[in-house]
């Protein structure tokens, strides 16, 4: 089984880094295929905690080749900040591969992202302000800068000039900001050329050959299904395809090479930024989930919105992605609750919806219909099998599996790599 795709099933921050890292020692390549440094993941190895934003979490596993695919937008300054920080802590980053076709976040992309959000005011999307959306917009408008362009200064300058002809007019006339210098932008981008040269390659070809050798390739999705540009809660979404299909376009592999699709889902729900969230808790219960779960953004540090588990979203994710296995994370965060609600359907203006409403307006007005499950008080962080879990925790996991659309193959009971209950082999 050479290819496995790993995605988030909710609105991100599900613990994909932990799931990727748990698989990492058994795979040969870990490929990031979408997004940029707008999504962070934290991996705990022993007493060491690593916060990654752009690098694939497989970079922490010796022997694994980490890959950044063509579907990623790359802030080169952030890339080398992460590489240098990991190198200083003894992590070998020399095997990293970077697609020549990946698009580059230029300084003006960050500026435009930030001023646009401020300009929108109450209508803002809630971006991280890191230039992700503007870079993808340039890609679609065919005026983007790719990694390979850094190796031809004349082409690079031509592209920067063409982009800034339009963007400086916008900055000056609409946003009342100063113009961005072509020379400074070109100089900034060229400063990274020598450092990226050893890692730049044809990622699609590299991965095709690896799969032909029956090596195991793990495709690691950024963000999550409900933030997908096409299938998420538009317009409150990211700018890339964060569903399993994005692995094919974002890394250059055909769909028939993918053998298994794993979706990571929290035992409750969180969201960062604007947009609908039917099970959101705006009271003391929501704050307790936030504090107990450490729900503060890896990238931004801002508090995450919290709510109960939403099986409607899980079923949707299972269908959209073709999920073969779920990994349930942060079950330990629910320890101590007397009763745990689970959303099994929505009420929209008196009508029951077992699936996500088609219209944005209906989704905004959706009210959760809950079933309730008995909680537990026992410490579960030492559990390594289902039998180690309290009966009520076992019943909760089994209930989520029954209503979520696919089997739950692993359960996270703590932040460490070893704190996982494995029910089914994800690679078997």
From Swiss-Prot:
Sequence positions that bind substrate: 298-304
Active site, renumbered: 13 (proton acceptor), 41 (proton donor)
Cofactor note: Binds 1 Mg(2+) ion per subunit.
InterPro entries, per database record: Adenylosuccin_syn_GTP-bd (IPR018220), Adenylosuccin_syn_Lys_AS (IPR033128), Adenylosuccinate_synth_dom1 (IPR042109), Adenylosuccinate_synth_dom2 (IPR042110), Adenylosuccinate_synth_dom3 (IPR042111), Adenylosuccinate_synthetase (IPR001114), P-loop_NTPase (IPR027417)
Gene Ontology biological process: 'de novo' AMP biosynthetic process; IMP metabolic process
Binding positions (GTP): 12-18, 40-42, 304, 330-332, 412-414
Function comment: Plays an important role in the de novo pathway of purine nucleotide biosynthesis. Catalyzes the first committed step in the biosynthesis of AMP from IMP.
Protein name per the record: Adenylosuccinate synthetase
Gene expressing this chain: purA
